[in-house]
């Protein structure tokens, strides 16, 4: 018993009736105090104010003031009888809310005029002041409610507490009608509305999380690189897959189709990497090992003492698509006419020039070194080399042509090398020029102009009329000033070989760019596989120099062999050190060549897997410079070689000599010369031995002629060609008991003998030879259009009116390197 304190919440046993000592009633402490009520139909009654320990019947009493805690009324427990049938109850015990946070607030205390809300069990309710009036016995519907976060503000029925599994359970009693029912509905509607808002917020949160996950996934997704550099040690299959944004399984599949087995962790050589990258249209550059000479790039300027560094002129490379005006721009700056001396008006080698002019700002003498690169697609490696040795790149775009494939490639080279770019929109004086369209295409290619809020400066120029050239030079000097270019002229010279060739009188000649230090006559120079003591230094005009400071391109004589374009050079203290360095490079190169040869043999084995083999054409290539040799080899690789294979026996710069002719005679090779001369003794030997020798000065002509020679070795092929078509107009009996078709030629001509097809409703009924045609009563060999004739066949006579006869003739054609699309 408890006569004072907090209200008592009785336990309810819903399984069976029992008796217990009743507890005295309590007076509510406030109108909002919680007072659980259990309503169970019962025949007997107990005095008002008593509380039973289990489900019992309460008889409504006359309205009277509630009892006070000071004068409790104690009564004996009353044994109650259960009704004939247990009350119907709907209970859901899935979720049990916390006891300290009830879902529904307690109803106001029972008082006069409020008894209607708690009328007899199942009563009508709503009869204020006459609680218990409705004495109809109806089973109460007890529901277990799902907790609501916002339910604390809603009005509803009182909740009961029940021990369930050691936790408090909230039991809601659903009224059956009256004002209580209306309040319960109102509270439930508010809860449902709050729940709908909560679900909507949760759904929005889920969508936001999904969008964030997608953004992170896209940001982390691998992007295909446009240019891949491969060192002498090769790359693993997994590394190739990462750079191509594919799976290692894709790389393994490509190699498997070529007859090469591989694994994701396996390292493959440069040749196999190129096969995979060609499949996905990605360019591959072979880089030398980054120790020894190649590692000197890391020593440029960075290892020098700060007080020894001085400002140096900028090195500017001009790049862009073919015929967009790169060389014309350089002509105007140099005040020369280089284009007039180039074959077909296109640049086919790297040109390096040192230009002196008055500064556009203060008129002081200013120096800039320019490098002009080819725009033809065959000179990809030259453009890549130009991008790696430059400080600033000028991307020339024609205003009437826009961004072209080689323009995009040049942009990719500059981005890969991290070189700042200045865009020169050329030919603004021509009809059809549209600079705005060019800037839009540049933005799509990843270069947003400064005028549009980007970081790439653009200058509108006309290389022929000189419009905008002053502004372009100012932009170059401003960009160089921001870059703060410095070098140490007191250090031994280091730099890059821009171009090299073999001169018949002077020997190997190398065009080099000094990037740090000063190159002097008499220095011992090493360039990977070659070395030598510098005998002479000349500028682009042929003037002799005693020394070459940083950022100056010069020609060097004295090397023992022609170096490869792109090689790094360095000055050593003695010839012994130079020889040791070259020997070390040769050993490394041999190891790499063994791996390359093994890969090449696997590819050739795959080409001959059908047992038929390929016809091989041997070629000896002689070019003016090593860069041209590199470009022509790349161009010849683009020719289809599924039917005939090109094999380069020798590819080197220099004129055609007697030894070249003897090598061609012993190997059965064709000699190709590009911008070279032929020694007189070699010319006489070529005529005597009958060697095929062709020389060119334009790379387009060389590639086209080689394609024609390759197709000539394939021979002719017989191809069926449609000659005519006829329609069967009548069917009649022939003398030999067979049926003959009376036909009208509707297109072309019918020829005998020839191969024909008989079609009925586009379905082929017969394919075979037509040996005889009759015109009236005469045998003829040919019938033209709109002419009637008779046709009889030895193996077919199921003619019907409306049948079509298609006649084919055989045509002899030159076999092509690749199949002609249908």
Curated annotation (Swiss-Prot):
GTP binds at residues 320-327, 372-376, 426-429. SUPFAM superfamilies: Initiation factor IF2/eIF5b, domain 3, P-loop containing nucleoside triphosphate hydrolases, Translation proteins. Residues 426-429 are annotated as: G4. Residues 372-375 are annotated as: G3. Keywords: Chloroplast, GTP-binding, Initiation factor, Nucleotide-binding, Plastid, Protein biosynthesis. GO terms for cellular component: chloroplast. InterPro entries: EF-G-like_DII (IPR053905), IF2_II (IPR044145), IF2_N (IPR006847), P-loop_NTPase (IPR027417), Small_GTP-bd (IPR005225), T_Tr_GTP-bd_dom (IPR000795), TF_IF2_bacterial-like (IPR000178), TIF_IF2 (IPR015760). It comes from the Eukaryota. Residues 320-327 are annotated as: G1. Residues 35-45 have a biased composition (Polar residues). It is found in: Plastid, Chloroplast. Residues 311-486 form the tr-type G domain. GO terms for molecular function: GTP binding; GTPase activity; translation initiation factor activity. Residues 1-188 are annotated as: Disordered. The keyword Cell membrane does not apply. One of the essential components for the initiation of protein synthesis. Protects formylmethionyl-tRNA from spontaneous hydrolysis and promotes its binding to the 30S ribosomal subunits. Also involved in the hydrolysis of GTP during the formation of the 70S ribosomal complex. Belongs to the TRAFAC class translation factor GTPase superfamily. Classic translation factor GTPase family. IF-2 subfamily. This is Translation initiation factor IF-2, chloroplastic. The lineage of its organism: Eukaryota, Discoba, Euglenozoa, Euglenida, Spirocuta. The gene is INFB.
């Amino acid at each position: 018993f408890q006569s004072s304190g907090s209200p008592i919440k009785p336990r309810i046993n819903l399984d069976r009736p029992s008796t217990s000592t009743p507890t005295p009633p309590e007076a509510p402490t406030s109108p909002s105090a919680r007072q659980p009520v259990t309503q169970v139909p019962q025949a007997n009654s107990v005095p008002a104010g008593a509380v039973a320990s289990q489900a019992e019947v309460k008889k409504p009493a006359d309205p009277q003031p509630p009892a006070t805690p000071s004068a409790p009324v104690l009564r004996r427990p009353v044994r109650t009888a259960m009704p004939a049938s247990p009350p119907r109850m709907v209970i859901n015990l899935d979720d049990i809310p916390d006891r300290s946070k009830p879902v529904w607030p307690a109803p106001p205390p029972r008082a006069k005029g409020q008894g209607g809300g708690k009328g007899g069990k199942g009563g009508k309710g709503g009869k204020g002041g006459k609680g218990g009036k409705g004495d109809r016995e109806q089973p109460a519907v007890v529901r277990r409610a799902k907790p609501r976060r916002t339910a604390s503000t809603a009005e509803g029925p009182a909740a009961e507490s029940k021990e369930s599994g050691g936790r408090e359970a909230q039991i809601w009693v659903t009224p059956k009608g009256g004002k209580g029912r209306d309040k319960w509905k109102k509270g439930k509607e508010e809860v449902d509305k709050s729940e709908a808002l909560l679900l909507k917020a949760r759904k929005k949160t889920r969508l936001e999380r999904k969008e964030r996950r997608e953004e992170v996934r896209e940001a982390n997704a691998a992007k295909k690189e446009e240019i891949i550099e491969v060192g002498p040690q090769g790359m693993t299959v997994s590394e190739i897959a990462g750079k191509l944004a594919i799976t290692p399984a894709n790389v393994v599949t490509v190699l498997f189709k070529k007859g090469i087995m591989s694994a994701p962790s396996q390292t493959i050589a440069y040749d196999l990497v190129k096969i995979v990258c060609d499949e996905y249209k990605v360019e591959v550059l072979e880089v030398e090992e980054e120790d020894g000479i190649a590692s000197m790039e890391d020593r440029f300027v960075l290892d020098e003492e700060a007080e020894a560094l001085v400002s140096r002129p900028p090195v500017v490379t001009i790049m862009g698509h073919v015929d967009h005006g790169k060389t014309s721009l350089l002509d105007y700056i140099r005040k020369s006419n280089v284009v007039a001396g180039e074959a077909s008006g296109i640049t086919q080698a790297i040109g390096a020039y040192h230009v002196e002019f008055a500064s556009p700002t203060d008129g002081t003498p200013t120096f800039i070194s320019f490098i002009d690169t080819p725009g033809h697609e065959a000179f990809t490696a030259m453009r890549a080399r130009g991008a790696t040795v430059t400080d600033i790149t000028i991307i020339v775009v024609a205003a009437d042509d826009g961004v072209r494939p080689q323009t995009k490639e040049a942009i990719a080279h500059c981005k890969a090398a991290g070189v700042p770019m200045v865009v020169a929109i050329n030919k603004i004086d021509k009809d059809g020029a549209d600079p705005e369209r060019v800037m839009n295409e540049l933005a799509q290619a990843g270069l947003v102009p400064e005028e549009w809020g980007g970081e790439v400066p653009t200058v509108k120029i006309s290389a022929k009329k000189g419009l905008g050239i002053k502004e372009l030079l100012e932009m170059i000097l401003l960009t160089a000033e921001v870059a703060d270019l410095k070098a140490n002229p007191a250090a031994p010279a280091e730099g890059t070989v821009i171009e090299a060739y073999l001169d018949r009188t002077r020997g190997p000649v190398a065009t080099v760019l000094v990037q740090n230090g000063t190159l002097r006559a008499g220095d011992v120079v090493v360039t990977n596989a070659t070395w030598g003591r510098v005998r002479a230094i000349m500028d682009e005009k042929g003037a002799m120099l005693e020394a070459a400071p940083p950022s100056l391109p010069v020609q060097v004589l004295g090397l023992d062999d022609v170096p490869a374009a792109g090689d790094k050079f360095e000055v050593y203290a003695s010839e012994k050190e130079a020889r040791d360095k070259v020997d070390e490079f040769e050993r490394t190169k041999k190891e790499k060549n063994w791996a390359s040869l093994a890969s090449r043999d696997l590819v050739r084995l795959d080409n001959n897997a059908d047992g038929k083999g390929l016809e091989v054409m041997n070629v000896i290539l002689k070019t003016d410079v090593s860069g041209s040799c590199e470009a022509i080899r790349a161009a010849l690789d683009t020719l289809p070689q599924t039917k005939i294979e090109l094999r380069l026996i020798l590819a080197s710069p220099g004129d055609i000599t007697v030894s070249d002719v003897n090598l061609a005679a012993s190997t059965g090779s064709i000699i190709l010369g590009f911008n070279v001369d032929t020694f007189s003794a070699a010319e006489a030997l070529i005529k005597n031995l009958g060697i095929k020798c062709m020389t060119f000065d334009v790379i387009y002509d060389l590639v086209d002629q080689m394609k024609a020679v390759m197709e000539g070795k394939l021979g002719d092929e017989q191809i069926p060609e449609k000659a005519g078509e006829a329609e069967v107009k009548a069917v009649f009996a022939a003398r030999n008991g067979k049926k003959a078709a009376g036909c009208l030629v509707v297109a072309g001509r019918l020829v005998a003998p020839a191969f024909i097809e008989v079609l009925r409703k586009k379905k082929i009924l017969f394919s075979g030879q037509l040996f005889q045609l009759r015109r009236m009563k005469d045998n003829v060999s040919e019938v033209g259009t709109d002419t009637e004739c008779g046709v009889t066949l030895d193996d077919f006579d199921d003619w019907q009116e409306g049948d079509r006869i298609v006649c084919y003739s055989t045509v002899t054609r030159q076999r092509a390197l690749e199949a002609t699309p249908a």
